């Protein structure tokens, strides 16, 4: 599991390795046909600052080679803002005095119809807070079932699930999962997520392994850049 891999990584040694990279290391990484982890450290090091435009051009070239000159749009739809976590940066924080809403099946379908009136959108991202008791797997499965006649590509951004739960949702039309990981630094993770299910670091980072085990087609890990790692 990914959490086991993280245990073997020293933040101090990794930081030292990044800051020790030289101009020659950066140029070697830019010329490499396939980058290694060591090459990646060179490209995010202070020594790479003069090469930002070069990296931008390479990034554009590789992106066009992989995806073509296309733009793919998706619509995010919040099914509920109910959440049992206490993430310090989030407006859904359980202690925030705000009205909590969980859309009913009828309200969900009304939202789908409204989205289709906006344009020919086919990619839908269903988003929830973390409240498995009130908006758990069965609720998400129902939302996916309702969405299938309207959209061809269905993704979710919800609480981390068990492998068998991800697999269950694939049978309801799930194509992909997006999961935000605010930091991979275990100590700082505790500061940002003091209470709730999301405070379980290993459960969170190992979610990507469980998605793969379940056969989820598209797995999208996202990392915030404004939180100190």
Predicted regions, residues:
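Conserved small/polar residues in nucleotide/adenosyl-binding loops
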Residues: 225-229
């Amino acid at each position: 599991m990914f959490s086991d891999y993280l245990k073997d990584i020293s933040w101090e040694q990794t930081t030292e390795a990044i800051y020790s990279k030289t101009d020659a290391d950066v140029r070697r990484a830019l010329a490499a046909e396939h980058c290694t982890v060591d090459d990646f450290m060179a490209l995010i090091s202070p020594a790479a600052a003069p090469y930002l435009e070069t990296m931008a051009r390479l990034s554009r070239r590789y992106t066009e080679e992989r995806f073509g000159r296309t733009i793919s749009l998706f619509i995010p739809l919040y099914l509920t803002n109910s959440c049992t976590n206490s993430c310090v940066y989030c407006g859904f924080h359980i202690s925030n005095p705000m009205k909590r809403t969980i859309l009913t099946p009828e309200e969900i379908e009304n939202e789908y119809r409204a989205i289709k009136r906006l344009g020919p959108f086919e990619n839908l991202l269903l988003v929830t807070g973390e409240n498995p008791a009130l908006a758990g797997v069965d609720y998400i499965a129902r939302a996916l079932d309702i969405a299938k006649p309207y959209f061809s590509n269905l993704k979710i951004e919800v609480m981390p699930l068990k492998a068998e739960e991800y697999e269950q949702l694939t049978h309801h039309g799930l194509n992909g999962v997006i999961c935000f990981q605010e930091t991979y630094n275990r100590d700082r993770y505790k500061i940002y997520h003091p209470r709730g299910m999301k405070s379980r670091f290993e459960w969170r980072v190992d979610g990507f392994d469980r998605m793969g085990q379940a056969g989820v087609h598209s797995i999208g890990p996202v990392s915030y850049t404004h939180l100190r790692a």
